[in-house]
């Protein structure tokens, strides 16, 4: 019987053909005790959740695992793991977790059931009691029921918090519980590695090093990359190096050697000041601008094009302006010397401030030629001639609207000496004495002459080429008495005005009484229009 069982085991269990069979001590037929045990386990499995059914299937596989020994190179069933010890530990842990879950659920159910019962009791009690007062025994019973419900609520809140904490711990995937999250300080950095494979080998060339550096080939120039190289400012020699700058550098070197203290360096001129200086300085030779910092293979061509643009359009206008200068200058050659002297002083004051050196503002010149750099000749205004003698003040009105004329003074009319000759027919409206503003005109006697002064309103036409009018106060008297009469006239006019204002009083006007118009007659008013527009006004 024992041999037959061995043959059956060997027939069912696969084994390697090149090794000896290892026979286990497992029995083929189950005993009565095992059958009874399985009967009870089936009843228990009906009570437990389907999660426990999976755990109960694993012990059945354990008997099958005992028949097969875990040997390397052996043929075994694909569904069964080779390590039985690992399977046993997994099964035991799963069963333990299932039992703990069942116990926790039962406790939770009991607590919730108690709280529900206590709440139901309280509801029934208060619905029956209504508004009646409670006795001491009833108060103690209500307090006990409230304590039970409060305890269950506190325990449920604590379990929820613990469950949340467990979920946080379980959320840490691929990470231990004590591990800290990666911070910025732990960020990865680049560390170059060297190939030392040929360090131990004896090479024929001793000059070649054993290390090979990892080289970044992206920095190498290529025909398909748009690379821009900058010239170094230290190695670059300025193009505007002249004899003046060399002399200045030699002098400064000598002063340093001799120990002479250097003067403070001159301040740089701003861009706007340099532009103004370049506009004022017309004779300054235009120098080539320094090469740009960016390497441009066509920079030489660009500079030539700019020179061509600067020179060609400005050549013609300067010649035209020079022709205008020749025409303008002869007009001002006949100006007297008194007008030239103040102009010379003004020009001297303009040129007197110390002009900056040429080297200080050449680099601030704008590259493009400005339209403001054209030569413009401004016509010099000659100073006006001032009258030699001042006239005495007089209150008489003396208006003169006249042009230049050459007429000799006559006995009947007195002409002003300063009036130039006019080329038009002139009318002289002469008045011997100014009339008062208010009141009737009165004839006054002057102190110098006892005869009354009569007004002479004479219109004297004169031959001239253009039209003009001269309003002069002409008197039939000598020139010596003219100034005395003017003074007397002012006094008499002021006295007469005061008398007239004192004699006449302001008349009161009555707005209720309509005023009869003296100028308009009955025939001049159109009655039809009055009726048509009567509705627009209030009477």
UniProtKB/Swiss-Prot annotation:
Subcellular location: Nucleus, Nuclear pore complex; Nucleus membrane
FXF repeat ranges per the UniProt record: 399-401, 427-429, 469-471, 509-511
GO MF: phospholipid binding; structural constituent of nuclear pore
Source superkingdom: Eukaryota
GO CC terms: cytosol; nuclear envelope; nuclear membrane; nuclear pore; nuclear pore central transport channel; nuclear pore nuclear basket; nucleus
Keyword terms: Coiled coil, Membrane, mRNA transport, Nuclear pore complex, Nucleus, Phosphoprotein, Protein transport, Repeat, Translocation, Transport
GO BP annotations, alphabetical order: chromosome organization; double-strand break repair; intracellular mRNA localization; mRNA export from nucleus in response to heat stress; NLS-bearing protein import into nucleus; nucleocytoplasmic transport; poly(A)+ mRNA export from nucleus; post-transcriptional tethering of RNA polymerase II gene DNA at nuclear periphery
Principal subcellular localization: nucleus
Residues the record lists as Phosphoserine modifications: 10, 49, 81, 89, 162, 171, 214, 222, 352, 360, 374, 382, 480, 483
Post-translational modification: Phosphorylated by CDC28.
InterPro entries attached to this UniProt entry: Nup60
UniProt key word Ion transport: no
Positions bearing Phosphothreonine: 460
Keyword RNA-binding: no
Chain intervals with Polar residues compositional bias: 242-252, 258-267, 347-359, 395-433, 448-485
Topology in membrane: Peripheral membrane protein
Region annotation (Disordered) ranges: 44-80, 242-267, 305-329, 347-493
Coiled-coil residue windows: 91-118
Domains (record comment): Contains FG repeats. FG repeats are interaction sites for karyopherins (importins, exportins) and form probably an affinity gradient, guiding the transport proteins unidirectionally with their cargo through the NPC. FG repeat regions are highly flexible and lack ordered secondary structure. The overall conservation of FG repeats regarding exact sequence, spacing, and repeat unit length is limited. FG repeat types and their physico-chemical environment change across the NPC from the nucleoplasmic to the cytoplasmic side.
Assembly: Component of the nuclear pore complex (NPC). NPC constitutes the exclusive means of nucleocytoplasmic transport. NPCs allow the passive diffusion of ions and small molecules and the active, nuclear transport receptor-mediated bidirectional transport of macromolecules such as proteins, RNAs, ribonucleoparticles (RNPs), and ribosomal subunits across the nuclear envelope. Due to its 8-fold rotational symmetry, all subunits are present with 8 copies or multiples thereof. Binds to NUP1 and NUP2 forming the nuclear basket and the distal ring. The interaction with NUP2 is GSP1-GTP-dependent.
Additional information: Present with 4590 molecules/cell in log phase SD medium.
Functional summary from the UniProt entry: Functions as a component of the nuclear pore complex (NPC). NPC components, collectively referred to as nucleoporins (NUPs), can play the role of both NPC structural components and of docking or interaction partners for transiently associated nuclear transport factors. Active directional transport is assured by both, a Phe-Gly (FG) repeat affinity gradient for these transport factors across the NPC and a transport cofactor concentration gradient across the nuclear envelope (GSP1 and GSP2 GTPases associated predominantly with GTP in the nucleus, with GDP in the cytoplasm).
Protein's name according to its UniProt entry: Nucleoporin NUP60
Species this protein is from: Saccharomyces cerevisiae (strain ATCC 204508 / S288c)
């Amino acid at each position: 019987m024992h041999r037959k069982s061995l043959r059956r085991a060997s027939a069912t269990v696969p084994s390697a053909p090149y090794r000896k069979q290892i026979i286990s001590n497992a029995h083929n037929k189950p005993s009565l005790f095992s059958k009874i045990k399985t009967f009870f386990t089936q009843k228990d499995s009906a009570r437990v959740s389907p999660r426990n059914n999976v755990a109960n299937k694993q012990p059945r596989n354990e008997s099958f695992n005992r028949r097969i020994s875990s040997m390397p190179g052996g043929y075994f069933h694909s569904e069964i793991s080779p390590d039985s010890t690992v399977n046993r530990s997994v099964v035991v842990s799963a069963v333990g977790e299932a039992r703990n879950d069942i116990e926790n659920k039962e406790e939770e159910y009991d607590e919730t059931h108690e709280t529900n019962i206590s709440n139901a009791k309280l509801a029934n009690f208060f619905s029956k009691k209504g508004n009646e007062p409670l006795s001491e025994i009833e108060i103690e019973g209500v307090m006990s029921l409230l304590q039970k419900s409060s305890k269950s609520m506190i325990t449920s809140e604590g379990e929820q918090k613990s469950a949340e904490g467990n979920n946080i711990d379980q959320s840490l995937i691929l990470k231990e519980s004590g591990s800290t999250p990666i911070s910025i300080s732990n960020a990865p950095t680049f560390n170059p590695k060297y190939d030392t494979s040929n360090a131990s080998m004896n090479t024929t060339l001793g000059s070649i090093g054993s290390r090979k550096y990892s080289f970044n080939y992206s920095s190498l120039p290529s025909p398909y990359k748009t690379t821009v190289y900058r010239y170094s400012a230290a190695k670059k020699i300025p193009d505007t190096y002249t004899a003046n700058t060399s002399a200045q550098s030699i002098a400064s070197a000598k002063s340093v050697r001799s120990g002479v203290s250097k003067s403070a360096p001159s301040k740089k001129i701003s861009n706007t000041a340099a532009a103004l200086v370049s506009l004022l300085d017309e004779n300054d030779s235009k120098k080539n601008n320094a090469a740009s910092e960016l390497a441009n293979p066509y920079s030489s061509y660009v500079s030539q094009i700019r020179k061509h643009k600067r020179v060609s359009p400005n050549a013609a206008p300067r010649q035209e302006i020079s022709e205008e200068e020749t025409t303008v200058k002869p007009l001002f050659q006949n100006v007297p010397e008194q007008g030239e002297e103040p102009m010379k002083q003004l020009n001297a004051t303009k040129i007197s401030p110390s002009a900056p050196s040429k080297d200080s503002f050449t680099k601030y010149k704008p590259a493009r030629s400005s339209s403001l750099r054209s030569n413009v000749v401004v016509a010099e205004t000659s100073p006006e001639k001032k009258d030699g003698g001042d006239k005495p003040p007089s209150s008489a009105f003396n208006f003169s609207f006249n042009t230049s004329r050459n007429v000799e003074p006559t006995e009947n009319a007195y002409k002003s000496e300063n009036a130039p000759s006019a080329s038009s027919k002139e009318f002289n409206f002469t008045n011997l004495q100014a009339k008062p503003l208010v009141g009737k005109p009165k004839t006054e006697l002057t102190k110098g002459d006892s005869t009354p002064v009569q007004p002479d309103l004479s219109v004297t036409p004169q031959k001239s080429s253009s039209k003009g009018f001269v309003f002069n106060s002409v008197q039939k008297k000598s020139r010596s008495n003219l100034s005395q009469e003017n003074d007397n006239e002012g006094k008499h006019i002021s006295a007469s005005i005061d008398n007239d204002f004192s004699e006449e009083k302001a008349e009161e006007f009555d707005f209720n009484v309509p005023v009869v118009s003296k100028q308009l007659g009955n025939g001049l008013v159109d009655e039809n229009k009055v009726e048509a527009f009567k509705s627009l006004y209030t009477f």
